[in-house]
Amino acid sequence: MEGIHMLRDLLKRDDYLIKIDLKDAYLTVPICKAHQKFLRFLWKGTLLEFACLPFGLPREKLRKIRKKCQTLLSGTEISVRELSKFLGLLTSSIQAIFPAPLHYKHLQRLKNTTMSSTQSYEAIVTLDTTAREEVVWWRDHLQAWNGKALFQQPVDLVIETDASRKGWGAYCEGVSTGGPWCSEEKRLHINCLELLAGSFAIKTFTKDKVCAHVRLMMDNAAAVAYVNKMGGTHSQTLANLAIALWEWCLENQLTVSAQHLPGILNTRADRESRIITDSSDWKLNPSLFQAVLRIWGPLEIDLFASRLTYQLPQFVSWKPDPLAIQTDAFSMNWGKIRGYAFPPFALIGRCLRQALSQKVVQLVLIAPVWPTQPWYPLALQMCTDLPLLFPMSTDLLEKDHQSHPLTNLQLAGWRLSADVSKQLTFQRKLENCCWQHGEEIPPVLMPQPGISGLAGVLNGKSIPFQYL
């Protein structure tokens, strides 16, 4: 059948097109005398018929769809026959409305389900919330999306993606990344995980891309099909994931296509999806974190986190992450932010040096109470408030509902600053330490296990903990 698909195959780069305004030229195309009676219309009481070729205005088609949408929204039920007609009206617009397939698949599934169970076109379909939302989209967005590019934009970015039962992986332009699934994601079918991996990969590697066409290389045929067709009707979960991916891409002015990559060649992304070895990615119990916010908030950026452990809407990851605003906290300037840092313990000293070198005004640090560590005296010196001592418990730290293996870990929260005036203001409020060198520390009335009640002594001043 001749149409826009044939034209796309005939044209090539640097061809010239001539546009003819048929507003007048179409009047030169005659209609067979015997067929003119089929082109009659009534105007001001007079019956007229076309002797030449008539052309309808595109806006009339738009009005027809919007009018039908309004009719559907005025009620809650429709027959399968009428729904089929409406779907035919929508599917006929695919060549002109780019995101059309995203917004009728639920209606299509509703029709198929009803037809399968009743075997009758006269059966009544009740429009649920999702169905009505699709109709509303057509009513409200039809004009804005009217007009679709004839040719697909050239590919700007190629991303290889893969999924395993452990996690997801991706590779793009020499950079590899990946991460584990959360407990809810692990229960999904592998096809869904493959599509989710593609979604994570796009969000990870397109943070600085606008108006770009992204090509996903995937070794799962179902995921490829659902991306290219903007959804499907066989799997509701897969369809929802595909719609969510496309809506995010359109919101960020991106287009996406998928291509099958044989599994034997998809080695780089596959490797990332199976090597899940980050044992330092944990977060403070959310209830304790909220207590920290109430005392020292608001805080702006979580400097050491991942999509499974972040505590603030904006966070920085140590490797490319779909939700992180940036990678590598040490490459940032902390001087003008109210940062929250729960770094791997081996990086605590580096964090303190970064805060000093960048003259950080305030940093909330979560760190263990390890007085013998080289960084500990510096942490005491930078304090601007009494450190918060967290109770030891099995749920002190968590990640995806898992407990940290170190059940006797003693953590504290520290409000730090590189501003010497703030440090001195805090130190003036402290009491003098009355202990002499060599004296035994007196027992506290309400001792914390393994803790004297003091964070330490600085310049002859005692720095006690405050307890949560």
What positions do the PLM features span?
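C-terminal functional segments of enzyme domains
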Residues: 94, 255-296
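A short, polar/acidic, helix/strand-boundary loop motif
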Residues: 2, 45-55, 71, 142, ...
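RNase H catalytic domain
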Residues: 202-271
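Conserved catalytic palm subdomain of right-hand nucleotidyl-transferase polymerases, strongest
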Residues: 1, 6-28, 78, 82-85, ...
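C-terminal reverse transcriptase regions that engage the nucleic-acid substrate
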Residues: 9-12, 49, 58-150, 263
